[in-house]
Amino acid sequence: MATRVAAAAMIAFALGCSSSAEGPHSGMSADAGDGSMGSPDGASSAASDAGTPPGTDQDAEGNGPPAGTAGNNCPPSWTTTPACGGGSYDAGVPDFGPNVIVFTPSMPMSTIQNQLDTIYAKMDADQFDDLGYALLFMPGQYSLDVQVGFYTHVIGLGESPDDVTITGAVRVMADWLGNDNATQNFWRTAENLAVVPTAAIDDGTDIWATAQGTALRRVHVRGSIALYDDGGWASGGFIADSKIDTQITSGSQQQYLTRNVDLTNWQGSNWNMVFVGDGQPPSGTWPHPPYTVVNATPVVREKPFLYVDSGGNYLVMVPALKTNATGSSWGADAPGSPVPPGSPLSIDRFYIAKPTVDTATTLNAALAAGKHLLLTPGGYSLDGPIEVTQPNTVVIGIGLPVLTPTNGTAALTVADVDGVTIAGLLIQAGAKSSPTLVEMGSPGSSADHSANPTALFDVNCRIGGYIAGTASVCFTINSNDVIDDDSWLWRADHGTGVGWTANMSNSGIVVNGDDVTAYGLFSEHHQSFQALWNGNGGSVYFYQSEMPYDPPNQGAWMESPSEDGYASYKVSDNVTTHLAFGLGVYSFFDNPVHAANAIETPTGSGIVMHHMMTYSSATGGINDIINGTGGPATAYSAN
């Protein structure tokens, strides 16, 4: 659950650091056409070892070699060729199933509005479910009020966000829980569209009052946006690769990450606001206001996105790797001439999965036949893991599909190969406990993937809440160079199957690989370390965590016989290099228990931790910020 708000004294713990953190050198993104940067079709040694030379196409049925697209000779483009992402035919409009709804600007706006209102009435308060909706908008102009409820994914199908322009609102309100409280507005996304707020709706400000497990991506707000609803509590949140023309106001948001967003004018602060690679980030001196500014995003690929070509054919754009990136990837494009951020895949390169039909067997057969996966909305019961074994495979969900293992296995495993993309999934623990729900690389993985890393986007984890379930760990990352972009790893504190001995879970994430990077890591309520980092060279840009509410007593929650509780963020003693910016750890214990530290790390010169804070309620608490220093209650570090 999002943070409970409680009064606590504020203590400044000054170590002396400005709000502009020592980040990577500021600069524009790398040239998307530079093959050395590992385009999404990038051929790797793993691809070659698998027997697929660069540029090799799959056969007409999708059978045969790896799902890697076409090799690193594919230039940035909006169109495919037989050797670069092309399919065997013009696929046209795919059968996405009943919960994917496609709107066109030629439809009467009243008809679209009625359908949107019907869906929203169903999803507004539908906190726990496994069936969502993907709402797809063909390029054009719309006049609509698009309210985004639980498990709702709003997608523009243009090459540029401005190709789909919605005049009115694309908004998330906080009415269902009462008191304009947005702290449980989980699991929803909007991407690749423009919104023009109008005075008739919320006085002309777009409202995006969300909590964890949400995202705005490739969104152009042609006006102002507020991240809270009418002064009510809010606990988010994540925006990436977007542009805000006028003003963005955080209001009551407790914490937030914006990455590669053209902000124009950010207003507001509360506990922990982190800005990575943004255009026009706010200025100030930590901890008043609690801003962390990293000038450029060191290494990232943007999330793949759906779009249609002039013939109405669907494609998936897979953006290229970029380094030292500042600002949105598209905001400087000339109107009407969007620059391709990578190279595309025809939709018929994808196996389109449906929850009423598909199992682990059918999904793995599709992967073995060289297909990528596009999972449509709904709940997928898996008697074994989805096994991604080929480099450059894309597994993408629309409408927040929910994957649940039923036999105590992982829901998803990825081999130690280059360039895999996993996006838009909610992974849920089953009744039979899993050692891990997602595994990236097998134990002992050692390959260098720095030129073409695997990446996760908007992949979230839930243990309990909707169904009773247990898992030791949400994510285990064994491969090197993995990028995790926005993940909420949640042991449920309310809902079905919730209790100290019910939805048991040790950690949200365990990182064993080297040089793993996380942007927007949210991990909450697990029973040991929320995040355990065993690999060297890790980098985290924004961390938000609540310790478990429910330890029954101190004796039941001890890291060692002499140390109370567990640190939320633990960097193992063997680690020599680690970097983190903007970490917030909170405690709201139901019983009078304590954690000795919020964060524990080695103390060598290679361990660099910038801008940490804690918040504790009146019951129990966190004794220190890091390694026995920082003080109790609410405290800020300044380094």
Report each predicted region and the residues it spans.
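Acidic Gly/Asp/Thr-rich repetitive segments characteristic of extracellular carbohydrate-active
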Residues: 95-136, 341-377, 381
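Ser/Thr-rich, Pro/Gly/Ala-heavy low-complexity intrinsically disordered linkers and tails
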Residues: 1, 13-82, 90
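Right-handed parallel beta-helix
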Residues: 150-160, 183-197, 213-224, 236-246, ...
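Acidic/polar low-complexity surface segments
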Residues: 123-126, 168-176, 277-283, 324-347, ...
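Extracellular beta-strand-rich solenoid/capping regions of secreted or surface-exposed proteins
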Residues: 113-129, 136, 141-155, 164-213, ...
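Structural detector of coil-to-beta-strand junctions
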Residues: 134, 202, 209, 218, ...
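Domain-scale activation on soluble regions of proteins
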Residues: 93, 98, 114-133, 138-344, ...
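Bacterial N-terminal signal peptides that target proteins for export
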Residues: 1-7
